[in-house]
Amino acid sequence: MNQIRQAPAASASNATESKQEIRNYTMNFGPQHPAAHGVLRLILEMDGETVVRADPHIGLLHRGTEKLAESKPFNQSIGYMDRLDYVSMMCNEHAYVRAIETLIGIQAPERAQYIRTMFDEITRILNHLMWLGSNALDLGAMAVMLYAFREREELMDVYEAISGARMHAAYYRPGGVYRDLPDTMPKYKESRWHKGKALKRLNAAREGSMLDFLEHFTDTFPQRIDEYETLLTDNRIWKQRTVGVGVIEPDVAKAWGMTGVMLRGSGIAWDLRKKQPYAKYDAVDFDIPLGTCGDCYDRYLCRVAEMRESNRIIKQCVQWLKMNPGQVMVENCKVAPPKRESMKDDMEALIHHFKLFSEGYCVPAGETYSAVEAPKGEFGCYLISDGANKPFRVHLRAPGFAHLSSMDAVVRGYMLADVVAMIGTYDLVFGEVDR
């Protein structure tokens, strides 16, 4: 009788199990996660270890940069541009400054154009070294970060020598650059860690001018890139984590408005430095690295190759700048500050200086769009002037915003661990995404 009574209970249990629904698991990735590369909150819908849906939440670093720029004179918003993509500072400045120059109808001197080209490429190397070290660290390769920051520190010293700041330089100005290249480089001082022969070795490349220092850097940097590739390019674990992961087809890349390495990694040869040359990119020789498969590994190879091409461009700029001294700012006191010597003798020069830094200058009415090939993609500035000394409207086109928009479409079907690799390969900085 006991067996007869238990049979209906068992069948009822089976019926209950058949009615149960399998529900996906929702996971919050960030904003405190170290691999989120900032303040990204990614809500992942998981089916076991597989991503079913990804919902990026942004805005946690929104500072109203566009509106702030509309409330200040044109020349007082350059510092805001540095704080957008705070790993690619001078490239942001370049887009904004070029937009102002277009509306005013002025052009920077040739020497200033070469300096801008050189520092754009220095900034590109800075960005890619940061990306290389942090992305490798996300995937478990810890030593690469130490190697990448070794060279990054040298270029940060160049930033500091030219502008006084290691990051937020505010070096580009409408009509040229803040000042010419210095004749000396900062040197290491004696300490209990560095003294004697070790100190001399550290300062060996810093005895001459900044151009001498950069020339030495361009001679040694290719060997440094070889060291990065020794650590990663043929590393089995690195290839297992990146080959075939995050594949973006060319049509998908174009549909989402991707630019930069995200587009070139899929095999599309679009680079503003070649297609719509600005500054002195039409006067230097370089190639555009392209991917074939559009996966994380291809984008890694593209960025490494871009560092080699940037090194070539810097070398050419250094050679030209050594042979061609000249002015780095237009001689227009309505736009450029007068020389210090003239302000001591000429009252009109003093008035120009005061008006320039207190009220700025009026820009002719009109609108323009200026874009540069930033390390992360096309960074653009759409500027409208109504003839006043402040912009009527500033709109900034951040490449990371378009790239992050595709996150849901790209990560579906991949494992949770692959999401970290894909966020890293996007090279996101939320200063520009949130603005």
Curated annotation (Swiss-Prot):
Q: Which reaction does it catalyse?
A: a quinone + NADH + 5 H(+)(in) = a quinol + NAD(+) + 4 H(+)(out)
Q: What does this protein do?
A: NDH-1 shuttles electrons from NADH, via FMN and iron-sulfur (Fe-S) centers, to quinones in the respiratory chain. The immediate electron acceptor for the enzyme in this species is believed to be ubiquinone. Couples the redox reaction to proton translocation (for every two electrons transferred, four hydrogen ions are translocated across the cytoplasmic membrane), and thus conserves the redox energy in a proton gradient.
Protein family: Belongs to the complex I 49 kDa subunit family.
Q: What is its EC number?
A: 7.1.1.-
Q: Which GO terms describe its cellular component?
A: plasma membrane
- Compartments where located: Cell inner membrane
Which EC class is this protein assigned? translocase
Matching entries from InterPro entries are given as: NADH_Q_OxRdtase_suD (IPR001135), NADH_UbQ_OxRdtase_49kDa_CS (IPR014029), NDH1_su_D/H (IPR022885), NiFe-Hase_large (IPR029014)
Q: Which GO terms describe its molecular function?
A: NAD binding; NADH:ubiquinone reductase (non-electrogenic) activity; quinone binding
Report quaternary structure and partners.
NDH-1 is composed of 14 different subunits. Subunits NuoB, C, D, E, F, and G constitute the peripheral sector of the complex.
Coiled coil segments of this chain:
none
- Membrane topology note: Peripheral membrane protein
- Alphabetized Pfam families for the sequence: Complex1_49kDa (PF00346)
NCBIfam families cross-referenced by the UniProt entry: NuoD (TIGR01962), PRK06075.1 (NF004739)
Q: What is this protein called?
A: NADH-quinone oxidoreductase subunit D
The encoding gene is: nuoD
Q: Which organism is it from?
A: Xylella fastidiosa (strain Temecula1 / ATCC 700964)
Keyword flag NAD:
yes
Q: Which key words tag this protein in UniProt?
A: Cell inner membrane, Cell membrane, Membrane, NAD, Quinone, Translocase, Transport, Ubiquinone
